[in-house]
UniProtKB/Swiss-Prot annotation:
It catalyses: (sulfur carrier)-H + L-cysteine = (sulfur carrier)-SH + L-alanine. Coiled coil: none annotated. It comes from the Bacteria. One of its GO terms (biological process) is cysteine metabolic process. It comes from Thermotoga maritima (strain ATCC 43589 / DSM 3109 / JCM 10099 / NBRC 100826 / MSB8). Transmembrane segments: none annotated. Belongs to the class-V pyridoxal-phosphate-dependent aminotransferase family. Csd subfamily. Catalyzes the removal of elemental sulfur and selenium atoms from L-cysteine, L-cystine, L-selenocysteine, and L-selenocystine to produce L-alanine. It is an enzyme of class 2 (transferase). This is Probable cysteine desulfurase. Pfam families: Aminotran_5 (PF00266). The active site is at 363 (cysteine persulfide intermediate).
Length: 413
């Protein structure tokens, strides 16, 4: 069971779905929010809200101070400098910012090679693919060769001699839960710009981009107890200084004349317009909550629940589970029940058992195609996905397993 304190921090856990207590297993999509985050949001709006970086009155100074202190806390968390922390609306915006700015600045040029893995969420796939049509750079794909979309080291090594300009890869698959060996990326691609999609990885462990040698790291706060509409892009200072801004407008400029524009210093030249001030400030409470809980404890708990779910789900006949099915699989269990569409499975789990899981292609259609190739069932180009976080328990896993068994029984009558 949850500790009383943790249970009280997440009021959503007290909900009932058709008389059943909610079992929230959709944290890979978005996490529940603790009371501390919501309280901070309310307090800031009532006591400190004003626009930032624009005025000298008391509220503006107070808001700007909290805003920049939040940036400093995220910089410390990532082992970076505040100038390397850019606030965005989420991982999708962060990645698009990096892609477009690399192109505008001429760092990524025609005939350069971009490597993208086939594990990617569309946010780290579509921008690279689509913009290659307009800018003439070449694109190649890192194809996973292991069990149901598992990326092996050899899959990376076979591309090392291609000298890619950019390597874009996730740190943890949002479909299979495979944790990629991000610590090895710089060794494999010593001269490449590496962009790491950390949307699923950072909520589970505090990766330090400088230590592992990546140039960009993108993630979203709503997947780690924070508000929606807040993302972080870490960018290596030496690269950011060369890059043209993604958006133009207020506060990202130094001087504007009739002839040209000069830009503000880092990180502000990448933060045009009024930012999502209150949600960014409240996101600091989410980070603090996780730090106080302890990321080692967060990681260990999620790992235990994942391995328990894998072990028990593998005992159910007619259930196909995707991913490596070993210690590399973390936080996510994607599966299908033979002969039953995942949308039907998810709907029944919700209505009959109070279980919230995701069903669909999870914004990863290229990976779905790979799963279909290896599937032993009539693969529906989608899966059910159960994902775990700090507020889940072993009892939640047991309810999920029993729910899947019941769904299978009902459809076999």
């Amino acid at each position: 069971m949850l500790s009383t304190g943790l249970y009280e921090d997440f009021p959503t856990l007290k909900m009932k779905i058709n008389g059943k207590r909610i079992v929230y297993l959709d944290s890979a999509a978005t996490t529940l929010k603790p009371k501390q985050v919501v309280k901070k949001l309310e307090e800031f709006y009532y006591n400190s809200y004003a626009n930032v970086h624009r005025a000298v009155h008391t509220l503006a100074v107070r808001a700007t101070t909290e805003f920049e202190e939040t940036r400093e806390e995220f910089a410390e968390f990532l082992g970076a400098s505040p100038e390397e922390i850019i606030f965005t609306s989420g991982t999708t915006m962060a990645i698009n910012l990096a892609v477009v700015s690399l192109l505008r600045s001429g760092i990524l040029k025609e005939d350069d090679l971009v490597l993208v893995s086939l594990l990617e969420h569309h946010a780290n796939f579509v921008p690279w693919l689509r913009l290659s049509k307009f800018h003439g750079y070449r694109i190649d794909f890192i194809r996973p060769s292991g069990r149901f979309g598992t990326l092996e080291m050899d899959d990376l090594l076979k591309h090392r001699d291609k000298n890619p300009k950019v390597v874009a890869i996730t740190g943890l698959s949002n479909v299979t839960g495979q944790r990629i060996p991000v610590e090895e990326l710089r060794n494999v691609f010593p001269n490449s710009i590496i962009l790491l999609d950390g949307a699923q990885l950072i909520p589970h462990e505090p990766v330090k981009p400088k230590e592992i040698g990546v140039d960009f790291l993108a993630f979203s706060l709503h997947k780690m107890l924070g508000p929606t509409g807040v993302g972080v892009l870490y960018g290596k200072r030496e690269v950011l200084e060369q890059m043209e801004p993604f958006l133009y407008g207020g506060e990202m400029i130094d001087r504007v004349s009739l002839e040209d524009v000069t830009f503000n210093e880092l990180p502000y030249k990448f933060e045009a317009g009024t930012p999502n001030i209150a949600d960014i400030v409240a996101s600091r409470e989410a980070l603090r909550y996780l730090k106080e809980t302890g990321f080692d404890s967060v990681h260990e708990k999620i790992e235990q629940l994942t391995q328990m779910a894998l072990k028990e789900m593998m005992k159910i006949g007619g259930v196909e589970i995707y991913g490596p099915l070993d210690e590399r699989q973390h936080g996510i269990v994607s599966f299908n029940v033979k002969g039953i569409h995942p949308h039907d499975v998810a709907h029944i789990l919700d209505q009959e058992f109070g279980i919230a899981v995701r069903s669909g292609h999870h914004c990863a259609q290229p990976l779905m195609s790979i799963l279909k190739e290896q599937s032993q069932i009539d693969f529906p180009n989608s899966t059910c996905r159960a994902s775990f976080y700090i507020y889940n328990t072993e009892e939640d896993v047991k309810i999920l397993v029993e729910g899947v068994k019941k769904v299978k029984e009902w459809f076999s009558r």
